Amino acid sequence: MSGKTLYDKLWDDHVVHVDADGSCLIYIDRHLIHEVTSPQAFEGLRMAGRVPWRVDANLAVADHNVPTADRDRGIADPVSRLQVETLDKNCADFGITEFAMDDVRQGIVHVIGPEQGATLPGMTIVCGDSHTSTHGAFGALAFGIGTSEVEHVLATQCLVQRKAKNMLVRVQGKLAPGVTAKDLVLAVIGRIGTAGGTGYTIEFAGEAIRGLSMEGRMTVCNMAIEAGARAGLVAVDEVTLDYLEGRPFAPAGALWERAVEAWKDLHSDPDAVFDKVVEIDAASIKPQVTWGTSPEQVVPVDAEVPDPATEADPVRRESMERALQYMDLLPGTPIGAIRVDRVFIGSCTNARIEDLRAAAEVVRGHKRAASVKQALVVPGSGLVKRQAEQEGLDKVFLEAGFEWRDPGCSMCLAMNADRLEPGERCASTSNRNFEGRQGYGGRTHLVSPAMAAAAAIHGHFVDITEGGRA
């Protein structure tokens, strides 16, 4: 019998019951909650006369609707304000720990979970949010769920799920200087497509993955969902353990030692068999820029906008044509010739301290281009913001004409005051470039923090590996 994959191990450890049709009841170790997908779930509990099964397994934070500027004035939009106030009330009523808007620990849910050590190896972790896959960077099985499932987890601490297939994405070799985890995962999505991981859980492995920091691994797993995968995983190693030790929710003392011993087995066995294997040479990856309205519509920064006429598949060709029309781009346009109106550095993909340091390194000593209307820097949490300010990064950005904001989801999605106007083009470190994602009629190009920072300085995309560091 062949060995087990990391996904097999995590799944098997959490199966409570198997039905005749193969569906499984699995136990959930950690439930992360935010203000958008939880109100109906809590109301369902009240109507049924239920209470959360394990209060301590839940951690809540408001992030999607919170303002990132003038926070002391409160939330102007009444719908956004109601969602945040409802979360506050629900957490108070049911005794759930919440990092409120005025708490320094508040931030984007997929930033604060790992930051607090609430995300731990071997766990099953769910949240009513697509990018819950982020937490798989810690050797945890993490995936997004719907509102009805949020209620189910609150009430029972279990979920009915079907096991996905196993995919291995092995990235061998080392990334070139200036090429980041964001470029790596965009290149993967460009290779396999947004449906390439459908029905699979993807384990990311290889020298390039092992060489990433935890911040980088979180970026990769964050965007596994954009490849269609149910979840993304990275095996536990010393990098994982070094990141987690001493964090508030992590075990300590003898419990830490016991946990580390258990976590050391959280890797795929050498003889494990995967249903699908994708091999990528890290040296072939260059800084990436999306040109269309799907993360798979991506090319290296030194390339040109592709021509739909060269695409044999009629469905893909039509998709490309529609994307070019929406993005107002012509085939053959050099990526470096695309000018941007706004720049957004933030989101659960790229708003951690390492991301801000990378952007600040590019910005230092330069000014935002006059043609760029706005360059937003939004830390992923209050603690990230505080650390960045202790390092003087806020001054670097402010002196360059960037805006330094409070933590939140911000311009990743048009659900708060930070959004694009119709026709505006944005270099964004977020994870989705769908039509209208950052605002009605807004045009999004996904890039790394360093690439976004360089675009803000130059007013257009530049290759930061070819002397384009402003």
Curated annotation (Swiss-Prot):
Belongs to the aconitase/IPM isomerase family. LeuC type 1 subfamily. This is 3-isopropylmalate dehydratase large subunit. PANTHER family: 3-ISOPROPYLMALATE DEHYDRATASE, HOMOACONITASE, MITOCHONDRIAL-RELATED. Binds 1 [4Fe-4S] cluster per subunit. It comes from Methylococcus capsulatus (strain ATCC 33009 / NCIMB 11132 / Bath). NCBIfam families: leuC, PRK05478.1, PRK12466.1. It is an enzyme of class 4 (lyase). Catalyzes the isomerization between 2-isopropylmalate and 3-isopropylmalate, via the formation of 2-isopropylmaleate. The gene is leuC. It holds the Pfam family Aconitase. It catalyses: (2R,3S)-3-isopropylmalate = (2S)-2-isopropylmalate. [4Fe-4S] cluster binds at residues 348, 409, 412. Keywords: 4Fe-4S, Amino-acid biosynthesis, Branched-chain amino acid biosynthesis, Iron, Iron-sulfur, Leucine biosynthesis, Lyase, Metal-binding. GO terms for molecular function: 3-isopropylmalate dehydratase activity; 4 iron, 4 sulfur cluster binding; metal ion binding. Pathway: Amino-acid biosynthesis; L-leucine biosynthesis; L-leucine from 3-methyl-2-oxobutanoate: step 2/4. GO terms for biological process: L-leucine biosynthetic process. Its cofactor is [4Fe-4S] cluster. InterPro entries: 3-IsopropMal_deHydase_lsu, Acnase/IPM_dHydase_lsu_aba_1/3, Acoase/IPM_deHydtase_lsu_aba, Aconitase_4Fe-4S_BS, Aconitase_4Fe-4S_dom, IPM_dehydratase_rel_enz, IPMI_cat. Heterodimer of LeuC and LeuD.
